[in-house]
């Protein structure tokens, strides 16, 4: 298999959530996150250099010695991957959280170039009973 094959948008986002976060593999940031990356939040757009992305994620993982995400729902359209996720966190203070959120990723040439997200909410997404 070609080691230089560009990952699909789904593969990039899965690696970002399942390996970078869950396995705390910050060494993968250069392979997954573009330089720069645009982060969208309600009322705000921020441009982060790769170094700023590394710093942001390092600080988050230091604050949360336990941090795990699972994908509850994923929708893909071309370069766009939307993920409804469940998360579990324990901070250095000992306080634990169950949370959920939705993020939209735009992936170009195997790297995340944009992320849209809003604040996470308390509680977990529940499995759909309609499928």
Model-derived features: where do they sit?
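Residue-level structural signal for beta-strand termini and adjacent loop
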Residues: 87, 102, 118-120
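A short hydrophobic beta-strand element
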Residues: 77-87
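Short, cysteine-centered beta-strand-loop-beta hairpins and adjacent loop/turn segments enriched
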Residues: 62-63, 89-96
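A solvent-exposed, acidic/Ser-Thr-rich amphipathic alpha-helical stretch
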Residues: 26-79
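A short, surface-exposed beta-strand/turn
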Residues: 100-110
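Low-complexity, intrinsically disordered terminal/linker segments enriched in charged
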Residues: 114-131
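Short, low-complexity N-terminal intrinsically disordered segments enriched in polar/charged residues
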Residues: 1-35, 129-131
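Short, surface-exposed coil-to-beta transition loops
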Residues: 68-69, 84, 97-102
């Amino acid at each position: 298999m070609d080691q230089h094959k560009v990952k699909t948008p789904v593969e990039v986002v899965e690696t970002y959530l399942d390996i970078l976060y869950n396995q705390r593999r910050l060494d993968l940031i250069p392979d997954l996150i573009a330089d720069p990356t645009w982060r969208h939040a309600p009322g705000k757009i921020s441009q982060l250099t790769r170094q700023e992305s590394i710093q942001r994620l390092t600080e988050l993982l230091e604050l949360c010695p336990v941090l795990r995400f699972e994908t509850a729902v994923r929708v893909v359209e071309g370069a766009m991957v939307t993920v409804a996720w469940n998360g579990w966190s324990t901070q250095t203070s000992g306080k634990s959280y169950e949370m959920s959120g939705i993020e939209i990723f735009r992936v170009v040439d195997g790297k995340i170039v944009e992320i849209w997200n809003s604040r996470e909410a308390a509680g977990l997404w529940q499995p759909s009973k309609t499928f």
